[in-house]
Amino acid sequence: MKKLLMITAMLALPLAAGDSHAGPDLSAPDAFAAASAGKVRLIDIRTPQEWRQTGVAPGAGRVDFHRGPEVLLSSVLQIVGGDRNAPIALICRTGNRTSHAQKFLQAQGFTRVYNVSEGMAGSAAGPGWLKRELPLESCAQC
C-alpha cells in the first residue's frame, strides 16, 4: 500500500504543476544514435520481466519504475554519477511511464531529461524500438 501511495504521489506531482508535457522527446533511432555516440545515457525504466521478454538497448541503464520514486531518483543519480545536468533519455514500453518519470526527474533538478516517447513497443509517437529493429542485448539474468 505504501508503495502504491508513493507511485501515486510521484505521478501526481507533475500534474499539479499543470504541465501536460514535459518535453523534450527523442525518437527511438535518435536515442540510439545519441547513446551510441556517448551524447546521452539511455535508461530503461520497464520491469525486469519486460527486460527479459524483449531484451534491452545496448548499454542502457535499468531502473524498475514500479519500485517507487526514491529508487528511481537514487538509481538515476547513481547511473549519472550524481550529475543532474547529464543528458539522459528514458525509455519504457510505450512512453507513458517515461513521461511521468521525466516530469518527476525534472522536478528533482535534472536539466536534460529526454523521453523516448515511442518506447520499445511503439505508440502514437512512432513504431518503437522493437519494430524499428534497433539493436538489443539479452537480459536473461535481469
Model-derived segments and their meaning:
Residues I91:
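Short, surface-exposed ligand- or partner-binding patches at beta-edge/loop junctions that are enriched
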Residues M6-A16:
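Bacterial N-terminal signal peptides
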Residues M1-L4:
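Positively charged n-region of N-terminal signal peptides that target proteins for export
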Residues R41-I45:
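Short hydrophobic beta-strand that contains or immediately precedes a catalytic carboxylate
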Residues G18-A37, P48-P87, T98-C142:
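Rhodanese-like catalytic fold shared by cysteine-dependent sulfurtransferases
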